[in-house]
Amino acid sequence: MWRPLENTPEVLEPYLQKIGVQDASVFDLFSLEEIPEYIPRPVHALLFVFPSSGTKTIYKGSRILPKDSDKVLWYPQTIPNACGTIGLLHAVSNGELRRKVNENDFIKSLIRTAEGSSIEERAKLIEDSKELEALHAAFAGPPLEVEGSEEDVETDLHFICFVKGKSKDDNHFYELDGRQEGPVQHSEIESDLLNAEVLSVIKNYIQSIDSPFFSLVAITTP
């Protein structure tokens, strides 16, 4: 079991830079009502954290694609508490960020291998990657513990990634969650990910889950 990541710029920005997106910047989004002017555009991905014990319904008008859809590169999550790293993998494997990963970084090699692999092979690729495990551990928080137990526990908070597809010509945005049945394709958008349509999907999830424990960050590059 891995230790969970925090959904904060202080954790995710250096992590992204370490895995090969040298000019990545990460910003907190504290409100869904107004799009902050201080966030540089374009925004290439959003990472949303919510309580996984809640009931998350598929947004009206969206559809679940096959796990091995060629529109996006989707990774299954099989390691407890690995959702933060899976979310980052989804971000850098799709949309504009996939074209910004350093060619010499091991993540670029992992992405290439994953694209030619079955879903089961992708899961094993992540499970067997000592480099990825070490990177996650370097940026993870302290172990979660239950009083009276020495065992680590699985967090209830879960990361999902909103990002565009692999092709520059694909204007749909996608919801990528390694615990679900596959990638979710949403509507086409004309702008970047910091968009009213995308925020509407996130608002829908917040309203459907009775909990204050949510966080949202935007990933940008110059």
From Swiss-Prot:
Disulfide bonds: none
Active site: C83, H158
Sites annotated Transition state stabilizer: Q77
CDD domains the UniProt entry points to: Peptidase_C12_UCH_L1_L3
Protein name as annotated: Probable ubiquitin carboxyl-terminal hydrolase 1
Family: Belongs to the peptidase C12 family.
Species whose genome carries this gene: Schizosaccharomyces pombe (strain 972 / ATCC 24843) (Fission yeast)
Keywords recorded for this protein, A-Z: Hydrolase, Protease, Proteasome, Thiol protease, Ubl conjugation pathway
Stretches assigned to the UCH catalytic domain: 1-221
EC number: 3.4.19.12
